[in-house]
Amino acid sequence: MAGSPSRAAGRRLQLPLLCLFLQGATAVLFAVFVRYNHKTDAALWHRSNHSNADNEFYFRYPSFQDVHAMVFVGFGFLMVFLQRYGFSSVGFTFLLAAFALQWSTLVQGFLHSFHGGHIHVGVESMINADFCAGAVLISFGAVLGKTGPAQLLLMALLEVVLFGINEFVLLHLLGVRDAGGSMTIHTFGAYFGLVLSRVLYRPQLEKSKHRQGSVYHSDLFAMIGTIFLWIFWPSFNAALTALGAGQHRTALNTYYSLAASTLGTFALSALVGEDGRLDMVHIQNAALAGGVVVGTSSEMMLTPFGALTAGFLAGTVSTLGYKFFRPILESKFKVQDTCGVHNLHGMPGVLGALLGVLVAGLATHEAYGDGLESVFPLIAEGQRSATSQAMHQLFGLFVTLMFASVGGGLGGLLLKLPFLDSPPDSQCYEDQVHWQVPGEHEDKAQRPLRVEEADTQA
């Protein structure tokens, strides 16, 4: 174990005690409040004389499987690019998502499906919980390698609550449409993580600079995450949209947007790369921006051409962000964004929200016909004009940025509590701080980790 005996003793107790407390408290709350909904409960379902073929499970579960794979495989492997942080990237993704999906079931349940004193859960609850876990993992990407697992669990504890409140305000109070989460998931998760990273700024992080890069095999493993995310992203955006034409259209728009963002990424990467060569960081990340940018508008009548245009724009903007804006973010704004979530989720998320404003403002009864009610119910009912819906969409973006910024600031203050274990500057981005790494003898391979230097900690 790297570090002093007192640090090792604290690490031995801190994570187990926190995991036991959080799981125990969650289990008690589940026992008191959580019940099956009428589509899951044996007695209620059969009492209603429905055919099993009508159960929502058969319509939603295939999408849930894809979303689940994205959260646990896609996000986990996308972050293994760091040469000595693969165990932590995949392992802490596993830990955070497993806790976040339980906690978000409770938080979202109290806000969305609390009836008769109970939270009623089904397959839609599982999808919503995974969406929330995705936002937490986006924030994790901004502080990857600089925080301990106990800090990350506390981050998730706070972020899930704020995610649920922000989502409730946007979807239920403002009537915002955001099927694929450009605002509620990507923008919120990115800027929560970026503000958190700013509060946890480490001026002496250069001591771990030699571990911040990738090696050939770590980039190859990260591409596994990229491919999983790329393939399943149409399901992610379409998972909770209206069955039928709405879900079909959402998947189609996402499909074309991802394809265009990939070509845009390859084009810009070669254009701005050294000697015209491609940068694997760009390909791993910016190629996915097409899925983010149509998150809000994918269920709308965006048109295939609109999806291609939005995807290409997102891929180019994301690539330029990785090449030029990411260094400025650290040097000028003191935001140490490990995974570049600002370029993959932040900027494309904001662009996606603005695209939603535009497409909502163009909505007409002629274009949507009877389908207007499933996409823009308030417009269909005459309670709101298309212009008013567009303004509500824009206001939803500002609300999301406010919740994310305030939440990230509060989270940073929470994670800076002195008793929380975090790696010193000289030991960041290193698996051996928290993991037993097979095939390596610490005394020989990681002797520098035993040196306690005077430096900052998160």
UniProtKB/Swiss-Prot annotation:
Subcellular location: Cell membrane; Basolateral cell membrane
Claim: ATP-binding is one of the keywords in the record: no
Region (Disordered): 439-458
Region (Interaction with ANK3) location: 416-424
Classification via InterPro entries: Ammonium/urea_transptr (IPR029020), NH4_transpt_AmtB-like_dom (IPR024041), RhesusRHD (IPR002229)
MF annotations from Gene Ontology: ammonium channel activity; ankyrin binding; carbon dioxide transmembrane transporter activity
Cytoplasmic domain ranges by topology: 1-13, 83-86, 146-149, 202-219, 273-282, 326-346, 415-458
One GO cellular component term noted in the UniProt record for this chain: spectrin-associated cytoskeleton
Signal peptide start-end: none
PTM (free text): N-glycosylated.
Function: Ammonium transporter involved in the maintenance of acid-base homeostasis. Transports ammonium and its related derivative methylammonium across the basolateral plasma membrane of epithelial cells likely contributing to renal transepithelial ammonia transport and ammonia metabolism. May transport either NH4(+) or NH3 ammonia species predominantly mediating an electrogenic NH4(+) transport. May act as a CO2 channel providing for renal acid secretion.
Self-association and partners: Interacts (via C-terminus) with ANK2 and ANK3; required for targeting to the basolateral membrane.
Protein name: Ammonium transporter Rh type B
Phylogenetic placement of the source organism: Eukaryota, Metazoa, Chordata, Craniata, Vertebrata
Gene: RHBG
